[in-house]
Amino acid sequence: MTGVQTCALPIYLKEYYSTLEEARADLVAMWNFFDPKLIEIGAIPNIEVAKAAYDSEARAALAQLHEFPSGDTIEEDHRRGTQLIVNFIRDKTGAIQPVERDGKVYLVVKDYDEMRKGVGMLLAELMRIKAEGDYDAAKALISKYGIHFNTAWRDQVVQRYKSLDLPSFWCGINPDLLPGNSPTDIRIVYPRDMVKQQLRYVVITGR
């Protein structure tokens, strides 16, 4: 075969491809957070950073529900990916559990080791699905864990956000990472404003 080769995975995984990729990207980071090599090279100061990342993922699955004030389904791929990760880990390991305090529900990490096992389990399955182009497995997994949510929790979260007077959506500017003379010598720069960033995404994704 000659010339530029293109990936055919979106053809096989169809409407579930983007959700799978969003979840897979997060899972790779979540798995590597607990690698002691990160502390060794100075990427993180201690293991508490990894624990905070796991706490943030659990919290995000609940907090993001304020973006869906009606209905009981999620269409956006990154939000589906977060629900997929947290709901899968809750179901398979019990490492994340709902806790009620002062009449408010929270999703709390009870066991970080078990959560990492769940991260590994789901990452392995998503990698298998991607490698085999297993559409039926992607559909079943995302339909079970990534699309539907607890509407009572959503209603509570919406009210909590209203009391904080926070915006429903926000946008961030992503940096470029410029390499230096060593693997840990990275310079962070912000060369684009929001408009240029979004136009760049259109060029990359074609949409």
Report the location of each language-model feature.
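Long, well-structured alpha-helical subdomains associated
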Residues: M30-I129
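Non-catalytic terminal regions of proteins
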Residues: V99-R207
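Short, small-residue-biased leader/transition segments that mark boundaries at the very start
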Residues: G3, C7-L9
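An active-site-proximal "capping" alpha-helix that borders the catalytic cofactor pocket
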Residues: Y17-D35
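Residue-identity detector for glutamine
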Residues: Q5, E15, E48, Q64, ...
